[in-house]
Amino acid sequence: TVLGSSSEGNAYVLQNAGEALLLEAGIPFKKVLAALGNNVKKIVGCLITHEHGDHAGRINEVLNYVVPVYASKGTIEAAKINSCWRPTHIRMENGSYQHLRLGGFTIIPFPTKHDSREPLGFYVWHEETGGVLFATDTFYLPCTFAGLNNILIECNYDPDILERNVTEGYIPEVLKERVRRSHLSYYTCLDALKANDLTPVSYTHLTLPTN
């Protein structure tokens, strides 16, 4: 379920009848709870990709409901956390991030490429939902996965439209360069989709001025 997917705020839910896994904390947590019938006990955890406000801006609200939150060490250090509850640091083990088991969900974190401290993407598997690839805010997808049932992937901008918006004065050159260095273009997204075995695909984090 997509609850928010833009620079205004990102939040997604993978769920079955008994469990829910949150991806990102970028919208008011009350909206997340409303989507889950106000059943906070159904939530087995929340995964955060990086510290930017549209992805982690509501992290304290999630923590205050005593929902387990998981993120990289760099993300936790950079996020503005003032809750008395703390996120769990996803550790590196022998050059790879540790795998997580949250309820019936198995999570494999992997590094992504963004202008943040230590961004991650996640492969999530559940017996009822199969394999889901979640990757957002990255200019390149370094990993491939087989047997995917769903892909939630960033598709942020069209390079030609981005260049035209600079020429016409709609956005500054510095913003263009930041977008190119930290977000996934249409064409790079297509390359990533071709490299992965997939069924349904959902595009996330579409940005209005660059599409």
Predicted feature locations:
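A short acidic, glycine-rich active-site loop
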Residues: 173-184
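Conserved small/polar residues in nucleotide/adenosyl-binding loops
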Residues: 204-210
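Active-site neighborhood of phospho(di)ester-bond hydrolases with catalytic His/Asp-centered motifs
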Residues: 23-26, 44-51, 70-73, 133-137, ...
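Active-site metal-binding motif and surrounding structural segment of the metallo-beta-lactamase
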Residues: 28-74
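Catalytic core of the metallo-beta-lactamase
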Residues: 98-154
